[in-house]
């Protein structure tokens, strides 16, 4: 089933109980464009950690304006509040805990009204995502997880963006093949896998939102 056909099907099944999460990376651009072209009225959930790059926020504004998105932002504590509760620079001392506070807990909150969630995961992004399926049951969040681009390559993502003149995060042009929070993201070298620039100085592989068996304070280890 193509990505477009899968989106049509899942929207027909779940309607306003379906949402799309966006990180404002290249795969987010593709999915937002597809949803718009298919005329699907889908809420878009953003997990704004308050630690994004300036270019990421600018990309968000361009995409929201172009596609007239209904953006849902779950409540996330400020960085200052986190410093008070957990101490300064938690991302350096315990990145798993930081991701849990700033991404996992807000996503749990955001998904409560929904029965299905569209994500931009692709199998070729990293070994930890190699077994991703297009439709999975997430017992952790109590929703169906829909991954229309699971079988797409990075090359196919860029070809779709180029063919459809879709706005994308300019950090991708500066060597950032995967983009997250400022303290935990660096450009990727040509010989590295796509997500190698994330948490590069640790053995952490994932922020935790896509790990079904992850527990509080233990995200990212597989």
Task: Please tell me what each predicted stretch does.
Residues 1-222:
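Nucleotide-activated chemistry modules centered on ATP-dependent adenylation/adenylyltransferase
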